[in-house]
């Protein structure tokens, strides 16, 4: 799976995605409302990232045998396809089914770019995944396909067992073997990209912060300047006082963390499942575990993310698309998804199947996902990322105290939401 698509929820908020030119990616449809009947449908088109090709090819054969419907596969830039969905809906040139990161589902649905989706009993959703595909208006615009969460990677050549608490990490930082060359008193024992709000949210939320109220749906209730948020920011700052100056580089810290870990100079890091392949390629003897318990005894409540199957608004036959989505999220097809991609199924029965494979990364993601909070999928979330990044940088660099940085960020978020959304 391309790391670009897998980690989309981590980066979509830090940059504005430009509209990308993409070869038309779907079956041509007439510019008219979706037909509800499916008796005449003989072919469907599904558009996915290249990494899902093998998976779709296998389940497409099964679906053609079961339903008598041929599935045509088109691959390309999945994020680019979402960016130009508005234009494609207008032209009627859309695939019948495609995939979208959860944080795009609610906003695209609310903007009228996606059809409503019914969650079948066979989907075996849980509360978190259902929330991730439900917009603020209460309508469901996707069927959960994959779950993702940040986890902890640790170097088995440096530490025998996975650190269980942040106190364990603090003790590692006292070990002189992790001293950073060239900067006296600095350590790389544990590293986390905590000027990136996606990575830091679990620390803040574990202390009682939240982005929006009502499970991420109420943009008028912002909880990033409460006592919990300030406590989390101050704890992050205590680590930045131990870390090399380069960790404050909002653009380059991620590369620094990866390099230090791959070179055996860092014992533990927080990152996503999309980094596993790079560590394998670098021949790091790594383990994967849940993120350690916070100093307050609470769990690291990272954003729960992943991807869903969605149906564009302009599909010719909504019922036929819905039936194929139901097929894709059923347990057997979700098992195939795991076997072909090693991505964690959203379907809880298939998730148990994946956990039974005794893969460290799989087990860690599944366990960590239980402590996650849904990544808000409302359009107003776009107003959060940059102010939140600035909040973290200003505080950990010492340019502002945590309370001032948090209050300034919330003020800017509210102003931006008012300007963009009239609220």
Curated annotation (Swiss-Prot):
Induction: By maltose. The gene is malX. Keywords: Cell membrane, Lipoprotein, Membrane, Palmitate, Signal, Sugar transport, Transport. Belongs to the bacterial solute-binding protein 1 family. The keyword Cell membrane applies. A lipid is attached at residue 25 (S-diacylglycerol cysteine). The keyword Signal applies. It is a lipid-anchor. PANTHER family: MALTOSE-BINDING PERIPLASMIC PROTEIN (PTHR30061), MALTOSE_MALTODEXTRIN-BINDING PERIPLASMIC PROTEIN (PTHR30061:SF50). Disulfide bonds: none annotated. This is Maltooligosaccharide ABC transporter solute-binding lipoprotein. It comes from Streptococcus pneumoniae (strain ATCC BAA-255 / R6).
């Amino acid at each position: 799976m391309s790391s670009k698509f897998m980690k989309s929820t981590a980066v979509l908020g830090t940059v504005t995605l430009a509209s990308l030119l993409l070869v038309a990616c779907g079956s041509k449809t007439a510019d008219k409302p979706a037909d509800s009947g499916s008796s005449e449908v003989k072919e469907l088109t599904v558009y996915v990232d290249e990494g899902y090709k093998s998976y779709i090819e296998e389940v497409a054969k099964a679906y053609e045998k079961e339903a008598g419907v041929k599935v045509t596969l088109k691959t390309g830039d999945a994020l680019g396809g979402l960016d130009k969905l508005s234009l494609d809906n207008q032209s009627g040139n859309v695939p019948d089914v495609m995939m979208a990161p959860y944080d795009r589902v609610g906003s695209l649905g609310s903007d009228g770019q996606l059809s409503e989706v019914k969650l079948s009993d066979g989907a075996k959703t849980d509360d978190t995944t259902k929330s991730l595909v439900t917009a603020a208006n209460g309508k469901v615009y996707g069927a959960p396909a994959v779950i993702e969460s940040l986890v902890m990677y640790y170097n088995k050549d440096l530490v025998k067992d996975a650190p269980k608490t942040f106190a364990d990490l603090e003790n590692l930082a006292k070990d002189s073997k992790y001293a950073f060359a060239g900067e006296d008193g600095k350590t790389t024992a544990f590293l986390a990209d905590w000027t990136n709000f996606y990575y830091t949210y679990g620390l803040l939320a574990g202390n009682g912060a939240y982005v929006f109220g009502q499970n991420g749906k109420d943009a008028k209730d912002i909880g990033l300047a409460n006592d919990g948020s300030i406590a989390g920011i101050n704890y992050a700052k205590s680590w930045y006082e131990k870390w090399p100056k380069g960790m404050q580089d909002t653009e380059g810290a991620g590369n620094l963390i990866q390099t230090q870990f791959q070179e055996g100079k860092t014992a533990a890091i927080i990152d996503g499942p999309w980094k596993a392949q790079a560590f394998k390629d670098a021949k790091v003897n790594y383990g994967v575990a849940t993120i350690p318990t916070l100093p307050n005894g609470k769990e690291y409540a990272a954003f729960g993310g992943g991807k869903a199957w969605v149906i564009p608004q302009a599909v010719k036959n909504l019922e036929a698309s819905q039936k194929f989505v139901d097929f894709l999220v059923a347990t057997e097809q979700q098992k195939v998804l795991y076997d072909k991609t090693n991505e964690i199924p959203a379907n809880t029965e298939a998730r148990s199947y994946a956990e039974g494979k005794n893969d460290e990364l799989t087990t860690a993601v599944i366990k960590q996902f239980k402590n996650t909070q849904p990544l808000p999928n409302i359009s107003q979330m776009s107003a959060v990322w940059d102010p939140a990044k600035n909040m973290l940088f200003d505080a950990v660099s010492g340019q502002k105290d945590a309370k001032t940085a948090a209050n300034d960020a919330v003020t800017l978020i509210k102003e931006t939401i008012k300007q963009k959304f009239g609220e």
